[in-house]
Structure formats: C-alpha cells, structure tokens
Amino acid sequence: MIKEVIFDIDDTLYDYEVGHAQGMKKMGEYAQRELGVDAGEFQEAYQRLNREITERLGRDDAAIHSRSIRLQNLLEQLQKPLFPHLNRLYHAYWDTLLEISAPEPGSLEAVKRLSENGISIGIGTDMTVRMQYEKLERFGFAPYVKHIVTSQEAGHEKPHPEFMALCVRKASCAPEECVFVGDTFKKDVLGALDAGMHAVWYNAKGKALPENMDLTGKEYREIHHFDELAPYILSLA
C-alpha cells in the first residue's frame, strides 16, 4: 500500500527551463543597463563562473544552487559594486521566473487527488530551501505538502542514499510504501529504486534514457502527462 508520494520540484511540478531562460534574459538586461556590461557577455561570464563554483565545491553541495553566491562572485570578478546590484540582480531573476512559470499541466490536480485519497505528499529537491518554499506557495502546492527534503538540509544531492533515506524517514513508512516522482532519471528514478522506493519518471519532454546504463531488474513507471499519475499510484495502493 502506498502511503506517501514524494515529488521533485524543478522540471517536474513546473517547467524550470522556461522561467530560467527569461530570468537570465532579465539579468542580462539589467547588467547592460545598470552596469554597462553587454548582456551576452554577462551571461557567458555567469555560466563560466557557475562551472568554476561547481568544480570548486563539487556536485554534492547545495551551495552550487545559490544564485546569490554566483552573483556575488560574478560582480567581484567584474569589479562592480556588490550593493545594490547583488540583490537587484537576484530579484530580477527570481521575480521573473516566478511570474511567468506555472504548474505543469495536471500536476496540481494529481497532487490534490492523491491527497484526497489519504496519500501523504512529500517533496525531495536539490536546492536551497527558501526559494523552493516560494515556488510551492506560488504554484499552489503548499497546502498539500506534509514533508520537505532539500539537499541543503540533507547535506547531499540526489541520488545520495542519505538524501533518499531522509525522505523515507520523514514519510514515517517503509521505503516500499513510498513513490518518488521526478524528471531526472539518474537522480529521481534510480536514486529512489536503490533506496527501495517505487519510482515514476516524469518524461514530458521525451528525454532519452542515459546511455550505457544497466537497468536489469529496475522496474519503474514512465509517464508523459500528470493525468497518468494518480490512477497508477492508486492502483498500487
């Protein structure tokens, strides 16, 4: 019997890429207007710095997601004043992303239906906490969420066993009574299966499976629309 469904947020409950592209555009426009830095050059420098920070911190540290840290370092490298531009760039990005983004079609309805059927709703996301709270409230998921695990809290990114174990521990049930739903195959699907959970791959964008991956004995469900989710979960329950 399924007692909890745990959702990834970015590119699962909403389309991150659409909002991200517009947020980056807005930051570039600000940089050109207020800092005298070409928008294209600003974005290239931002991406380069992002890679540098990831190399320095590694990929298992939630700090790699901190846009504030990236912007602080970028302004330092550009020899531009940190204040007031750091906070203004931060809000240019996030305010834009939140304004134009929306829940994935059928996602809110699926979460509501599962909750109404007595299934607890959890969140398992690679990110720092504050902005994930904002997204859940803005997109309407907050009233249904009982548990949240971020990589900032867990101390590891998905699919680390300790991240997944914390998800199960907060759910207060056995791993086989949990379903993890996400768009990233290695992190969300394999991470959940290795932890003993059921897994649903939300593949609305038609991604190909990662190459050279041994899936022997790995059973998971692939869906392309959230209309498919609740009937599948309830069939397990």
Placement of each model-derived feature along the sequence:
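Asp-based, Mg2+/Mn2+-dependent phosphohydrolase catalytic module
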Residues: 1-5, 18, 33, 40, ...
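N-terminal helical cap/lid subdomain that shapes the substrate entry/recognition surface
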Residues: 2-105
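Conserved acidic, metal-coordinating active-site core of Asp-based
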Residues: 92-98, 117-118, 127, 173
